[in-house]
Amino acid sequence: MKRIAVVGTVHEEKGLANAAGLLAILERIKPELIFLEIPSAALDDCLTGSRSDLESAAVSRYRAEHVVDLVPVDLPTPEADFFTNNRDLFERIERTSPDYCRPVDWHSQYVRAHGFAYLNSEHCGDLFSQLRQATDSAIESLADQRLAELYDLWIRTNTLRDQAMMRNIENHCCQTSFSSAAFLVGAAHRQSIITLSRSEPGAASSTVLWEFSGFLEEPH
């Protein structure tokens, strides 16, 4: 049985959500391979230490002491205008919706205060659900066709990414022998990954045991 621990992360260090905390989780999981939320084109930068995100820093420190394979599973990075448009979209929502700002602020506070224990909790998933509802309501209230289209594109893009990452992991499981792996993914994707792991079974499903929180505590 292949065990895959799905670890919800953030890409920038904030309080207890830091590289040292993620490294401690990796030391508990002891993965033989790590699935990464990056496209194949970014793997070289990760291997050479050129990437500056939290996950890359923790993985680099783990690789210094352990033999581990790194497997990129994300789709190619969208064009720059995708990110520019999304920044404009959410800045517009933030200026007009207190119901959106509250869960954003709460999330930031919880990440800083509780780190990975929060990022891999039902509480975090519930807060992202509140955030999605507040965003939906704000888009409806703004009644701006362009913003609605940008929001739909953002949702579709992330849905396709989640599906592709799970498909790529499953394909790798069919082709490779291992006992323990970690999947480092932004916490905003975590609930979708949980849902996909429980949906229509694929060829590797019977040989994969998904783990979503057991790695948070030291083994007894």
Model segments located where?
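Compositional signal for N-terminal targeting/processing segments
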Residues: 1-220
